[in-house]
Design a protein with these regions (language model features):
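Substrate-binding/gating loop at the entrance of the active-site cleft, primarily
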Residues: 24-41
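Active-site phosphate-binding strand-loop segment of PLP-dependent enzymes
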Residues: 50-121
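Conserved active-site segment immediately N-terminal to the catalytic lysine
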Residues: 106, 119-145
Length: 189
């Protein structure tokens, strides 16, 4: 997933010139923050531990209302702390991402490993908790190599909402000659 993270950070921080910061909800993977530093992208962070449940919304909004946050990244479930965000916390993240037009980078490297409920039956409830139920501004980053315990193999997926994938970004058009977030040039070129 390392390269997937790097690309998401880079693209998200270039969509809107006013939004140049990645917000980390910690604990997270140190390599993600290192990638942001290497790329020269501004970042902020807060630790989820003291801001669970109803405290999450005000804390998250205190960053988003500044208008400079391009993306929010968190791991759910989280390793090594194994913190799992609740459905209401994910709703808060999704709704605020929509309100402030911020992209949610949901790290699902350990998808299905929330052992509070049985998630091991494909196409049957309960399903993986995700902020994608509450916003169209999401990229789900999934690691098949971790989920399926592939020793040595690296398989990753970036699942992007259709609305986000097809969104027009003038800053990307100006910089790269493409106007969409994750596709080749469109007829709007």
């Amino acid at each position: 997933l390392g390269d997937v993270y790097k690309r998401q950070f880079q693209i998200c921080s270039q969509c809107d010139p006013k939004k140049d910061t990645i917000l980390f909800i910690d604990p997270g993977f140190p390599v993600q923050r290192q990638q942001v530093r290497i790329l020269g992208i501004k970042h902020e962070s807060f630790d989820i531990y003291d801001f669970r449940a109803e405290k999450l919304g005000p804390k998250l909004e205190s960053y988003l209302k500044q208008g400079n946050v391009a993306a929010i990244i968190y791991s759910n479930p989280n390793n090594p702390a194994w913190i799992c965000l609740t459905e209401s916390e994910l709703r808060t993240i999704g709704e605020l991402a929509t309100k402030y037009d911020t992209i949610v980078l949901e790290d699902l490297a350990y998808m299905g490993m929330d052992f509070r409920k049985e998630l091991g039956h494909p196409f049957k409830a309960p399903f993986q908790a995700t902020a994608a139920r509450y916003t169209d501004n999401y990229v789900l980053m999934i690691s098949g190599s971790k989920i399926f315990s592939y020793a040595g193999q690296r398989i990753a997926i970036a699942a992007i909402s259709d609305k986000l994938r097809n969104r027009f970004y003038p800053a990307l058009k100006e910089r790269y000659g493409i106007c969409l977030l994750y596709t080749s040039p469109s007829p709007r070129d």
